[in-house]
């Protein structure tokens, strides 16, 4: 585990490099993951084992970039996860013909707890992931965000991501227990 940034507000952005690093922060990550995705516009319900699986799977993928924004108290207030798009088969299928999957890094997860938003933390997690991507292997970054073009969309656009015009329907369990689909929009950036 390596500290990439120590912010003035007491938050450190750390890079998890091994499954053992993930074990140290597992419980804190699970709590943050469940809380963040339970909020609009996603309103998704994840059980603890599902959230834990996100972290474990990411750390097993070669060339992953797994970042947590943490406090000394052990609280995880945000996260950013990236890995080769080839590790996410459904996404790789959607973008074939748009970007070369073997040269594309997928920014799979970005989340910041509600009380820690509007402090530049989301942008900083994106910037740190961009800095960690191996540009010898990957020429493009791809992500998907809510098609509602909310604050997250605007943040990515200001950072230079381009709207691809490609959408994907994502099915998920909602907070009310139902399963529904919503539309996600792909954004990309050349490195």
Please report, for each region that a protein language model flagged, where it lies by residue.
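Conserved N-terminal entry element of GNAT/NAT acetyltransferase domains
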Residues: 1-27, 31, 35
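Active-site rim helix/loop that mediates acceptor-substrate recognition in acyltransferases
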Residues: 42-71, 76, 81, 87
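Short hydrophobic/aromatic beta-strand or adjacent loop that forms the aromatic wall/cage
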Residues: 64, 181-187
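Conserved acyl-donor/pantetheine-binding loop and adjacent beta-alpha core of acyl/acetyltransferases
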Residues: 81-109, 168-178
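Conserved acetyl-CoA-binding loop-helix of GNAT-fold acetyltransferases
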Residues: 112, 118-133, 154-158
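Conserved acetyl-CoA-binding loop of GNAT-fold acetyltransferases
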Residues: 157-166
């Amino acid at each position: 585990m390596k500290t990439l940034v120590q912010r003035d507000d007491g938050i450190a952005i750390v890079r998890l490099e091994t499954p053992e690093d993930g074990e140290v922060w597992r419980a804190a990550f699970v709590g943050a993951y469940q809380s963040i995705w339970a909020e609009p516009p996603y309103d998704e319900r994840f059980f603890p084992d599902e959230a834990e699986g996100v972290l474990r799977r990411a750390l097993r993928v070669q060339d992953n970039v797994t970042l947590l924004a943490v406090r000394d108290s052990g609280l995880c207030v945000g996260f950013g996860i990236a890995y080769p798009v080839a590790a996410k088969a459904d996404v790789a299928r959607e973008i074939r013909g748009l970007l070369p999957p073997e040269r594309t890094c997928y920014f799979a997860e970005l989340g910041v707890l509600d009380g820690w938003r509007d402090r530049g933390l989301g942008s900083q997690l994106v910037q740190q992931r961009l800095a960690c991507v191996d540009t010898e292997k990957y020429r493009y970054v791809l992500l998907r965000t809510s098609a509602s073009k909310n604050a997250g969309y605007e943040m990515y656009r200001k950072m230079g991501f381009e709207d691809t015009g490609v959408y994907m329907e994502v099915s998920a369990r909602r907070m009310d227990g139902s399963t529904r689909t919503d539309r996600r929009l792909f954004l990309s950036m050349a490195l």
